[in-house]
Amino acid sequence: MTLPASKKSAPLGKIILIVLVLVAAAAGGMGYFSQKSNLDEAQTQTAALSQQTVEKVPAPLDPSDALFTAQPGELVFGKPDAAGTIIEYSSMSCPHCAFFHSDMLPQLKKDLLDTGKAKLVFRYFPLNEPALRATQLVECAPAEKRAQFIKVLFELQKNWAFSERFKDELKTIAAQGGLDAAQVDSCFADKQLEDRIIEGRQVAATRAGVNSTPSFFVNGVKLEDFSKADHFAKALESAPKKPAQPTGDAE
């Protein structure tokens, strides 16, 4: 009787090589997912806030409410005693916010801020942990450099906002502004500062109904369409007039 021919087995060396490749790939994948998991976990720190924001939309505030005036220590673009007040709620990781600052703010500055028709009060509304840490970085910068930090962070947003190594990228940017790694680490670890930023976001969400960025209020009235710079001027003409209140830190 003739036995059927057996299939030729793969060489042992080849099998070992395949196993090693699979192990290496698995290890690399585990490392990737571990990093991604860490980032996801960090970003959930603000997820609860987002849920709180959309669960209840408050009734519109009176335009004269103190929330729509510049507060001491806030960053103000333009002349602090300008008659009109534009409030901007912004997230440092928000691409639309970056676009506003690069493409629309210069025109707004020329038409309204430099002429004294209005001032722009910049407020933080971080949407995720990278934005929160970038906000802390701005607040830890010297007062006279905060506007420049915001400008650079928006210009370099693609470098850090969507990176798993966003803290390292932020440290690189901070170094250009004179903050060393130890100062940045201390800034990120400042729980009081973090709580103050998150509290400001909660106030905007629960009292003014802010649920996206950027959001703008012109003399206390929400500007729904800010797709063009001249919409701000038109809103100023129709919005309630408010007495000038020279507060905040002028840029």
What is the predicted function of each stretch?
Residues 2-57, 65, 91, 173-251:
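C-terminal cap of thioredoxin/glutaredoxin-like
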Residues 65-84, 249-250:
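A short beta-strand-turn-helix
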Residues 71-75, 105-107, 201-204:
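A generic local structural motif
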Residues 80, 113-115, 130, 208-211:
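Extracellular/periplasmic catalytic domains that process cell-envelope and extracellular macromolecules
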Residues 86, 94, 184:
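Residue-level signature of catalytic and energy-coupling elements of molecular machines
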Residues 90-93, 98-175:
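Structural alpha/beta surface segment adjacent to cysteine/selenocysteine redox centers
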